[in-house]
């Protein structure tokens, strides 16, 4: 299975740089996994696609203003992208600079140069940085940090992104990228779903910058996934098991919810799913046997990305690539601020050969 099997041609003009003016007003491409049939609509159509007793699983992570600009005390500009908060004063971060800071180097951060920091140690590609400030990490980031827009949104972050690049139900700070399928849900839609009898549960997966890293091997089985922290608490496990027992569907809102639930299923010893509080490197690609998910709400993903592979494993490779080609023809908007898909599971996807006509 080659990375190039997941390539498709995407005009630059279809990459969304701003979200739809109304969260739930984006377009929705629906893909029926069993048949490959496609239908076009708007996001609020999910209300008609869900039944009373179905379970929606959301990721309640909150995007932190993780990008900081500054300089080394010795001179030279730096850009810090926080990957993970270690405690109240230390972070793991990506650092861009003409010359990487050495251990013990002093950093002066913020456009107003209000924060002193020290590079403590290097861990492979990440730098451990300590903020030499009595304030905690989150307070500092909220003061001097910028929203970490994805690399394909080619513009500076704006004040509005602090609201628009967050789900309305975010709770747990720690992500450096939004769980973007959730961006389309506004309070009126959530209320309408509750009134219909749709159940809701919340996992946490702190999305890392690794989500944007390209697959750097030709044979995808050789790819090593980046690590992200996920939590699937007991109440989510109970909700999933109750949903299955009554014959309803579990619908994941976004690939991060998929990866959280499937990680919890993989780690369960003698049960379908068990509580999970750990890092996950789960890599889902065609041939994977899904355990939990019956339907998926997700945005359109990058060509050759691990996320289009995840979707292909769920809906079937041919169905997925056909849907993406139709989406391009129909000028759907792509990536984080773009349009969405509603996909039902293709039970035959696991046996499908990838790349074969």
Curated annotation (Swiss-Prot):
GO cellular component: cytoplasm
Segments forming a coiled coil: none
Catalysed transformations (reactions): 7-aminomethyl-7-carbaguanosine(34) in tRNA + S-adenosyl-L-methionine = epoxyqueuosine(34) in tRNA + adenine + L-methionine + 2 H(+)
Molecular functions per Gene Ontology: S-adenosylmethionine:tRNA ribosyltransferase-isomerase activity
EC number(s) reported in the record: 2.4.99.17
Subcellular location, principal: cytoplasm
Alphabetical UniProt keywords: Cytoplasm, Queuosine biosynthesis, S-adenosyl-L-methionine, Transferase
Disulfide bond entries: none
Pathway(s) of this molecule: tRNA modification; tRNA-queuosine biosynthesis
InterPro entries registered for this protein in UniProt: QueA (IPR003699), QueA_dom1 (IPR042118), QueA_dom2 (IPR042119), QueA_sf (IPR036100)
GO BP annotations listed: queuosine biosynthetic process; tRNA wobble guanine modification
Compartments it resides in: Cytoplasm
Pfam families listed in its UniProt record: Queuosine_synth
Family: Belongs to the QueA family.
Assembly and binders: Monomer.
Entry function: Transfers and isomerizes the ribose moiety from AdoMet to the 7-aminomethyl group of 7-deazaguanine (preQ1-tRNA) to give epoxyqueuosine (oQ-tRNA).
Name used for this protein in its record: S-adenosylmethionine:tRNA ribosyltransferase-isomerase
